Amino acid sequence: MIQKVITVNGIEQNLFVDAEALLSDVLRQQLGLTGVKVGCEQGQCGACSVILDGKVVRACVTKMKRVADGAQITTIEGVGQPENLHPLQKAWVLHGGAQCGFCSPGFIVSAKGLLDTNADPSREDVRDWFQKHRNACRCTGYKPLVDAVMDAAAVINGKKPETDLEFKMPADGRIWGSKYPRPTAVAKVTGTLDYGADLGLKMPAGTLHLAMVQAKVSHANIKGIDTSEALTMPGVHSVITHKDVKGKNRITGLITFPTNKGDGWDRPILCDEKVFQYGDCIALVCADSEANARAAAEKVKVDLEELPAYMSGPAAAAEDAIEIHPGTPNVYFEQPIVKGEDTGPIFASADVTVEGDFYVGRQPHMPIEPDVAFAYMGDDGKCYIHSKSIGVHLHLYMIAPGVGLEPDQLVLVANPMGGTFGYKFSPTSEALVAVAAMATGRPVHLRYNYQQQQQYTGKRSPWEMNVKFAAKKDGTLLAMESDWLVDHGPYSEFGDLLTLRGAQFIGAGYNIPNIRGLGRTVATNHVWGSAFRGYGAPQSMFASECLMDMLAEKLGMDPLELRYKNAYRPGDTNPTGQEPEVFSLPDMIDQLRPKYQAALEKAQKESTATHKKGVGISIGVYGSGLDGPDASEAWAELNADGTITVHTAWEDHGQGADIGCVGTAHEALRPMGVAPEKIKFTWPNTATTPNSGPSGGSRQQVMTGNAIRVACENLLKACEKPGGGYYTYDELKAADKPTKITGNWTASGATHCDAVTGLGKPFVVYMYGVFMAEVTVDVATGQTTVDGMTLMADLGSLCNQLATDGQIYGGLAQGIGLALSEDFEDIKKHATLVGAGFPFIKQIPDKLDIVYVNHPRPDGPFGASGVGELPLTSPHAAIINAIKSATGVRIYRLPAYPEKVLEALKA
């Protein structure tokens, strides 16, 4: 123990600390400065950035023994407060720099460190600074953050008035389609929004901290579990195993596909008989501190009989592979696609055919905030779970039988959360904390470290694909054949739905009258597959978009013109036989053409013998919704103070549920003249909010947006006075009229895809885009640099352009990572952000251009579609096509690491 007298945010603090204690822990736990966020705990993400004696440091790797007496420290709390924002914070709000917001305090503190030393930086200075200080963002694509720093610098330098950093309301008062800032933005940029780990510091005395005992092998029988030594460790309350679980000890995948050969009850909460993947949780140590719990977890002894581990789809699908789940074949689901005529004769007689084998790998989500959850038994006897769930009502039914409670005895609440990008479509820590709270009767808190985030949360499922096109010599597509094998890891939840995506999106964007294909889902012992932005489209469209370029080359056609020739037009149908609701792709290609020609000319002019430049194109398509007649519910309530509360369970993991709720409600309530700041929204809670469905598949703006629209329209009708005007709250109460009105909406025009043919109308609203990538390839090293990305986007009528821009920038950045660096194949090497190929700012170009070519959707609320999936449908395919354009070599298996490109160049 040592004494430190330091000044934090201008206030002298007399502290007694362990010399080895981390500055981040002291600031958060002893001083309550939870604006200092902790992400990676390895100095790789910058979320914990503070200014220490004039220098930006990462507090999570700075030990107190290195902090001098008298040190001056500035955290986000010292930069600005909600009522007194610093220009950087104002600029962050204005430019949409805070999406999930978890990284925002660290970025803003880092940016202040820059402006304190360089008051007039260039954009490249800003980018170099954030790269040097390892400030990582997974949401924004970095461009809005640089925009914010530049504008803040201009204000600080007196080049702009500070009023330029404030949103200007449109003259008509309408915020639909504007850049109205997110309602949560100020809390995010000031560090005052409490995320799961922050809330954990506010739990009552007696709260137990949990640590997982995890498998260090990928497949094994469990012969015994010895907890005796762990129980003697300091601070340990108990060690929970499968014997303490009161329910079925399984998370159900809620299987709805009749041809699935499994029953969905294959994922243990705490492993009992077998380990199915590396990192599986075998026991939970409950202790008085996280450190004590983790130390004791190392003392639990597990006797294992190791089994063959199948770490890829082909290995698990081999005839001699043992069943991972005894009684269920490893290949447990098949989805055919049968459209039009038999393709065999068509391929035999076609002018041109082309074929390719493709692979998209196990992309990790890599949020900056690791998984976190807590649970407690409420005074009403119910078990309450607070987590990063993006499907609170969905998860309620997935975990209730496993923990041993009826759904009405379990409550799920979505915390303010960092980005998830889909991994939280699957439950992760929810069942674990519920089991612990029920077993101990005490509040419990569980926080994953970053290694656990990487190793024990789901990943994008890898696909092995073979796709063939048959075409006329003029480029008209005649037929397609496809085969795709989906490695979904050991747990089946949603694996069948993901496999169906291949039938829906391989070849999407083009009129292909005749299709035959088969998708198969296989259980393996690698990490389980979960939803990831784009959900099946990045795999599907990588194959078909690369193949389109291969066909263009064989025909001697320009790749853009081949796409133009075959893009959807009236009378055409998509792969499942559905006619698109709008036909914007030809228009988008027409508008892209001059940009494309200019990019080609620039690439040709600037290419050298050592650095080759190229341009690539791809089309992206995705549906907004869950398959079939998806539905949502919302409530609109007039409050006594004249405000309106929109009640939904629209989970916000950075995509903008706050502005989605407020923007949609404001548009619907315009006749009433309600100001946007008078519209409130709710945090998802299964006990107090309606079932709005999960935040995945770009469904919420369409499904819950429509439900909000209906609820608000119904509220308007309820409030209308016969002679004009609207009743007040008091008038409604006096007349015994309701002040809270329900709105329901169902995608009634959608149908499920057929189990035998794959045909159907799965979505009533789709999103469409055309991507262009510009790259430079260093032929000596194989290193690919993306110089610029352009997306022509049709997203209907935009609810909020600021949120939409941010979603697109972030999706493009993730596409660059998917194409070039991101993977989770090596369980140990890829267990950190850097190891897994996280794209920092210098890997993402500052040139990210968006052109909206929007066509209002008949079934979208006020014409809107979804947003989030589109920007990650196929940007990686455009990048790979650009590498081919630059060098003449094609990469078929992602990611296109430099050594892989170099090997192809030398072949």
From Swiss-Prot:
Cofactor entry: Mo-molybdopterin cytosine dinucleotide; [2Fe-2S] cluster
2Fe-2S ferredoxin-type domain mapped to chain residues: 2-79
Binding positions for Mo-molybdopterin cytosine dinucleotide per the UniProt entry: 653, 869
PROSITE patterns: 2FE2S_FER_1, 2FE2S_FER_2
InterPro entries with a match to the protein in the record: 2Fe-2S-bd (IPR002888), 2Fe-2S-bd_dom_sf (IPR036884), 2Fe-2S_ferredoxin-like_sf (IPR036010), 2Fe-2S_ferredoxin-type (IPR001041), 2Fe2S_fd_BS (IPR006058), Ald_Oxase/Xan_DH_a/b (IPR000674), Ald_Oxase/Xan_DH_a/b_sf (IPR036856), Ald_Oxase/xanthine_DH-like (IPR016208)
Enzymatic class: oxidoreductase
Name assigned to this protein: Aldehyde oxidoreductase
Species of the source: Megalodesulfovibrio gigas
Lineage: Bacteria, Pseudomonadati, Thermodesulfobacteriota, Desulfovibrionia, Desulfovibrionales
Gene: mop
